[in-house]
Amino acid sequence: MTTSASLERTPSKRDRDRERDNSSGLGSAGSLPASPQSAITVSPSSPATPKRPLRTSTPSLERKREREDREDREDRKERQERHERDRDHERFAAVFSTASTTVPTNTSSSSGLAPEQLRIPTGAAAFSGFPGLHSMSSLMLPSSAAVAAAAAAPFLPWSPILLPPWNHALLPAAFYPAALRNALPGLFDAKVPSSQRSGFHISDILNLEGSELKNAAAAAAAAAHHGSDLSHHSASESTSGHRGQGSHTSPSALSPTPAGVSADEHHNGSGTGGGAGEADHHSTTEHHAPPSHPQQQHPHHQQHHHPHLLLPQQHHQQAVAPLPLAHHQSGEAQSHAHANAAAAHLLASHNAAAAAAVAAGQYLPNLPKNFPGSFGDEMSSYHHMAQTMLQHSGRSAWIKENELYGTQQPASPDSTSPVTSEVSYTYIGSNCQTSPALSGDYKSYSRSADSDALSVGDALHTLHGSSGNGSAGGAPTAHALHNNNNNTTNNNNHSLKAEGINGAGSGHDDSLNEDGIEEDIDDVDDADGSGGGDANGSDGLPNKKRKRRVLFTKAQTYELERRFRQQRYLSAPEREHLASLIRLTPTQVKIWFQNHRYKTKRAQNEKGYEGHPGLLHGHATHPHHPSALPSPRRVAVPVLVRNGKPCLGDSSKLGADCVSVSSATATAMQNAAAHHLVALNGAAAYQHAAAAAAGLHAHAHAHAHAHGHGHPHAHAQRAAWWP
């Protein structure tokens, strides 16, 4: 009976053994598992029963096998529960840990020892007794003081997935530590155990030399007995993560951001993450040079990385696709790059916002001395912020307004003051408060950089690309803006001379009036970048004479014309008073009056308007001004045309779409006189004034001059200006 029962149970038992051997790969508690990691984590107290050949003849052997099966299942359950407990413990502890660690991304099959899988630069010798690591997540911690730092190790590469808010909130803090200190006061100093601080605080980022060298020395002492592992580690550190060769994530010894994030996400994932990952990578590669000779790979790899890192960093506002650096990656690196890509885009936008906020605030980041070398050029970080501000509409308006209004001369300096005479006098009327018409639109002052460099927007744009010929010191302060502004104006004076004299020949925008003067000025190369210039313009530098056209705003021209209609000659006190009202110099007012008298006289002689006192100043008068009305002694009647048909006859026979000749005479004559002078002077100075004349200018002045005066050449010249 026993034999038959055992024979009935034999097939099911045999199937169960076969399934167990095929599926689990773990075997009994004492047999060799599939991976060396799981072999290490097996409890040493578990029984080790060797496998015997399968025999089904005796029930005692079957009972032994059943007992072994139960023990195997219990061991598997225990290991699984231990995995779960350790994983949960690591997730909670890693949130409060900022210690820099070295984490295995793929455990090598040749070695399963703990010191080669986990290294902490400060006090690493304390962790030499680790039993082992199991698939990046099983830690058995011998010391409660090291819990926060050690438990974070396997968690760091997963941080973009598990804790996105922490990841993106902490990463910009490496570049702007002051913002983080204000937002999270005392977080890092309070959460890190006292035994793990070793003199590091978040403020040490501002001065990396002393404290990071101390930690680098500690790391060298701790890593002295890890020769082979250090070579892998240094190679991975300088090549942004050889993820597939059992190497480790770069430990940034002083970064408050998680080390796995700073190296893997910034280099593999984004390539656009602002300055944090780049600064961490280069600072660690520089300061870890003392430990051993494999670090000599760093200069090559740094040089190799610059074209990849600096290119997207200058234009990081657009969410650039991740750069997977294929020549440095192998194995798991591709998958990690794809896993970090989504987080990288969020990070880039967050860093852009942080840069704009910092630049628009009251402080600039106090960059450490080793940043220029790692960024590649001295103004890179400041260009980063300036370019960011120009991409945000609210910020660009703010910087233009403050730069425009902050650099004006409080008094009325001489016209021979250096470069700032252009910046201060040309657009200064928009800040004058003497009349409602003086509130100009400073946002539209940006003009083409090749025609002139007066507008603040162009000065800021050229600041981003002209650190070589721009600022002398390249210091990232507010003076760098002004220095580049002045030097850019100096560098473009040749184009000012060539194109600015033509006035309206190059299309300017409507907020500017193209009336102006050409004056002999002392063009001084302002090399000190002070942005000032005293009243006499003598700062000890050699001067050279140059003709330059100074353009006036509409408000300044309007005030000059109004005064010219009242009084054609001004005394010296009157000139000074008028100049102080419209923020010009007395010399500029005098030259403008001289030029205006000459223009009106020449217009009288050439066009035969000697008997028209109202038209003497016609081209400078607003069309609706009372003094703009022509004299009734000599009137040229305009012929109005609508849809190709002349509107003739008395007012009772006029069509609905025709306008009476008598009501349109004054405006038409005003426009006609204005456009004769426009054609003669070769400048479209008063298009905006004539365009305001109730829509009558196009047909009225054309036929008035074509039929009434018979000037075909003037009509042909007007055709170029009026469609």
From Swiss-Prot:
Keywords: Developmental protein, Differentiation, DNA-binding, Homeobox, Neurogenesis, Nucleus, Transcription, Transcription regulation. Residues 298-307, 703-716 have a biased composition (Basic residues). It is found in: Nucleus. SUPFAM superfamilies: Homeodomain-like (SSF46689). One of its GO terms (biological process) is positive regulation of transcription by RNA polymerase II. Residues 545-604 bind DNA. Residues 1-115, 224-307, 465-549, 703-723 are annotated as: Disordered. PROSITE patterns: HOMEOBOX_1, HOMEOBOX_2. GO terms for molecular function: DNA-binding transcription factor activity, RNA polymerase II-specific; DNA-binding transcription factor binding; RNA polymerase II cis-regulatory region sequence-specific DNA binding. The keyword Transcription regulation applies. GO terms for cellular component: nucleus. Residues 37-48, 237-255 have a biased composition (Polar residues). Residues 512-528 have a biased composition (Acidic residues). Its main location: nucleus. Residues 23-36, 97-111, 483-493 have a biased composition (Low complexity). Expressed in the CNS and midgut. Residues 10-22, 61-92, 226-235, 278-289 have a biased composition (Basic and acidic residues). InterPro entries: HD (IPR001356), Homeobox_CS (IPR017970), Homeobox_NK-like (IPR050394), Homeodomain-like_sf (IPR009057). Belongs to the NK-2 homeobox family. Probable transcriptional regulator involved in the regulation of the proneural AS-C genes and the neurogenic genes of the enhancer of split complex. Could specifically activate proneural genes in the ventral-most neuroectoderm. PANTHER family: HOMEOBOX PROTEIN NKX (PTHR24340), HOMEOBOX PROTEIN VND (PTHR24340:SF82). This is Homeobox protein vnd.
